[in-house]
């Protein structure tokens, strides 16, 4: 056995020399002894192509390209040992999950870590690392003993505990595998054991190419190959000059030199004959002087500058998308103008999770065939999600999110239904489940579900309509479609006594759902749409899931396992599934990660994402062991994978290999902002290249072509799909500013689209948006009548909504749009409860001919409990009875009603006003309803304003009878005359108008009532700040102040004293008014004269008539109001409908000026002519 090294810098022809030797040997002796060509896994396909790609060698049996793992498979097939089942990454994770669950109580560190994302990936990686470095469970145990004996600090104790846990888990893992299964590292260990018995390898010519380091396990394989083979050639990327002096860890080729010495040591131990090392000094790869200079002087300090013509380009981009589009345009140019093939080009990157989706999308748009050398997770495939969410439903008590994740995979749908119809029905079904809070036992109970449209607390709920019955039947039918297969799965899993029976339950679940047929439908549909990558996904995922179940059964089939552990193990396995990469076609751009890629025969390389922290990478202390812990183990003589510090030192070699891949052109780029617009920095690596090549001018890549030259803009004309967006951009520019100079070629591009039979329809649809104006066209009279009827009947809040935004009114009352109902307690529900509770108490007092003042504190508490218990079953589908949390909330609401009752009691004691009616309807029909406020509009349409008044109070004195309105609010509110002027606050004055106009309801025939005011009563249970020694009476007084009613009252001192008989001078604690010593009102008093109330009444009528006329004439302008920090859009549900956008010319807020009450009153007078 002899050993020969072939060394040389990148591009010196090491691989070419080896391949030519093999090809010459095959040409001369095609049937000689075996030639093994060992390369890293990523290089096998392209090396095989290179080996048999010459004119002389079209095929070969004698020479084979292997990775170490593929060689293991080949040898085990020959000499035996491959009968043990292979366990893949998913199987490893499942087995480790099972071991963790059984070992939990005995672990020190990893007891709770199993629930962290990525834990099993790290744990599996740690065990694989142990194996690669020939560390057995007994070695790990010895490590623990040594560490435990010398642990004095908390950090040392933590490491000892961690090693103890790892030893237990590793030992259990190995015991589970022994004699039955092989993981990837076991194959290599078996290869070491079986190589001496292989006739295939005996006396083989062995080439090892493309490596710059070997793990101890790989070195052991090399040792065995030295014993079996006839001759071994190993290529290493290293400069011969490096051996002339001692190397240190900062040298570019430090790692390679270490590898060279390790292999030589193995050769010495095996007494292998050392042949003369072949040192290659030429650079045949580089056809570009600049790239040759970059390779030759990459590590030079200071940087050797190159002033000649360069084939290196450096770009910064506005964002990631602009960067990738710039790459795509240049690739198309190289292919079109410089005779490149797509296979001549590679795109290299590091942070693939940020780039892969963008690359797939944009390269498809630019018609660039490409291959991404990266495995994709199966986690998001419908089949994997269906199984995972079904198991989560069972383990998580049928939670809403798990149920509808499962539903949205569409694998629960019956096979023969129309998907479009079923999707719509399932959307309705989801809305029902959200509205009724369906989860848990509601899914599995035998009782059918009920459906009732929402009714107020005053409406009866006994009679079911035909519409409700139909919806009920539909909801129960859909319920069975969803729950039946999952309940069957649940029952089978609970009955199962072994893992095999549990896996069988999952298999039957999928078979009974006709999943194979449904996946076949998806595959056919993907093929028909030309998406062949995703078409193969559907075949792969079924096969992988079946393999997963088989592996589970093979490993643990006869074991008993709790349902929760089974679900955890199964979920862990599902999360580890990955799609296999389809080998690239003969002409595709290769997209690869710089850490794992091994490229050859590349003419142009695009390095993208060269940002600070990425190239070179910022070390991340991930994995089971930290750098400090690895250093401790290294000091104890334990060799493991490099620390992040060592990895960082190797970064320069990784980057060196990256920039020396191409023979002709190198492009380096980075975005200056991420997807969220945050600033990114160019890397120090880019700056280094710029220093080496001063003549290279950094260019900026943008998606906005307006500031570019004509030549640069022409480069943006690529595929029709992509160019259409740039035509849009340019026509927007032309629309605003016109074209200047020689940019009128865009009209030629435009003409292509509008005259092309293939693109005319799509371009018309896209380009029509150029003249889009987000305006709502006025409705015709006919459409307005259809939507609103021949007679307008609406509440005051509807009229206020129109003045806030006419389009929001149209969406809610014309189109009848509404948010979907969610099973939760919102502010309107709480407000409704408060109103109903106070009404019930007040009705009881009226029936008993008592007032609030007659109630004791104990009665207030008793009544608050009584009414809440009565209302709770009727509110929002019994939401207050649905959970312990809502039961607690019910108690808090009862306390608010209790507090409010106490305050109303105090108000009643201090007031000459008494409630005479509650929840007074007007325009609602029925004997108890007051008539509506009626209008005949100028266009002849009749309009009625209707509503319900919370409370009407009456007081009498020698000057007459007075009526006032009290409105209960669950938030603080005051009457702002500016809002009255703009028609945004009409409710209270309307109510006052209605009761004054219908005063006979509460008075003797012929008597006239005067307006006393309108007041808001804030229902709440306030907190107050008091001194530590405050008495209970003082605290109650402070609380009472928090209930001061705001609004507008009659500017009559006697009437104000009727509202607060304790008021002589100063501010009232009950209403927002105060008196000076001379009997006049204080400046802060919110008062109006009787004449002003009359003016306000006229103005409200005038405003309603204006609103009614606009509604009937079809005004639906997208014109939300804005006043100060208030805006109609703030809480609007219809923004996604109207698409209001301030950047559009037609979309601007209707800005309203805030005014003092006196100024607003003056404007109101002007409007009504007084």
UniProtKB/Swiss-Prot annotation:
Residues 281-587 form the UvrD-like helicase C-terminal domain. One of its GO terms (molecular function) is ATP binding. Its EC number is 3.1.-.-. Keywords: 4Fe-4S, ATP-binding, DNA damage, DNA repair, DNA-binding, Exonuclease, Helicase, Hydrolase, Iron, Iron-sulfur, Metal-binding, Nuclease, Nucleotide-binding. GO terms for biological process: double-strand break repair via homologous recombination. Its cofactor is Mg(2+); [4Fe-4S] cluster. Gene3D superfamilies: 3.90.320.10, 6.10.140.1030, P-loop containing nucleotide triphosphate hydrolases (3.40.50.300). It is an enzyme of class 3 (hydrolase). Binds 1 [4Fe-4S] cluster. Residues 1-343 form the UvrD-like helicase ATP-binding domain. [4Fe-4S] cluster binds at residues 805, 1129, 1132, 1138. ATP binds at residues 8-15. PROSITE patterns: UVRD_HELICASE_ATP_BIND, UVRD_HELICASE_CTER. HAMAP family: AddB_type1. Heterodimer of AddA and AddB. Despite having conserved helicase domains, this subunit does not have helicase activity. The heterodimer acts as both an ATP-dependent DNA helicase and an ATP-dependent, dual-direction single-stranded exonuclease. Recognizes the chi site generating a DNA molecule suitable for the initiation of homologous recombination. The AddB subunit has 5' -> 3' nuclease activity but not helicase activity. PANTHER family: RECBCD ENZYME SUBUNIT RECC. Belongs to the helicase family. AddB/RexB type 1 subfamily. This is ATP-dependent helicase/deoxyribonuclease subunit B. It comes from Bacillus cytotoxicus (strain DSM 22905 / CIP 110041 / 391-98 / NVH 391-98).
